[in-house]
Amino acid sequence: MKKIFIIEDEILIQQSLKKLFERRGYSVDVSASGKTAIDMILVNEYDRIICDLMLQDISGFDVIEESKKKFSPEDISKIFVIMTAYNSPQVLSRANSYQCRLLNKPFEDLDEAMRLMTE
């Protein structure tokens, strides 16, 4: 069973994604805090980490930077999916520097979003 970690401070989105993944057979951990998420990432193994960019305590980019203590840049590009409602040129440029998948919120096509988060 694949293990997914969702880092999202909007509880409705967090819980909706958790239920969708669990229905598809995934094991799912969640966190609303970027700082707590970092601690969890460093001690757990995840097949995919889906991280909102704008968290209440730190940014999703901060989570990725701290994850470099465990993962190589190549691993980060394969494991992380960044979710954001902000797609400014600066955000896109920084996301591209990590070579992570970028998923815009709100999701226009839920099936497509789920595919991008799991492939």
Regions found by a protein language model. Give the residues of each.
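Two-component/phosphorelay signaling modules centered on CheY-like receiver
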Residues: 11-29
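Active-site residues of response regulator receiver
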Residues: 52
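Conserved acidic carboxylate
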Residues: 8
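Alpha4 helix (beta4-alpha4-beta5 surface) of REC/receiver domains from two-component response regulators
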Residues: 62, 86-104
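Acidic, metal-coordinating helix/loop segments flanking the phosphotransfer/catalytic sites
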Residues: 30-48
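Acidic catalytic/metal-coordinating carboxylates
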Residues: 33, 59-65
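The feature encodes the CheY-like receiver
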Residues: 56
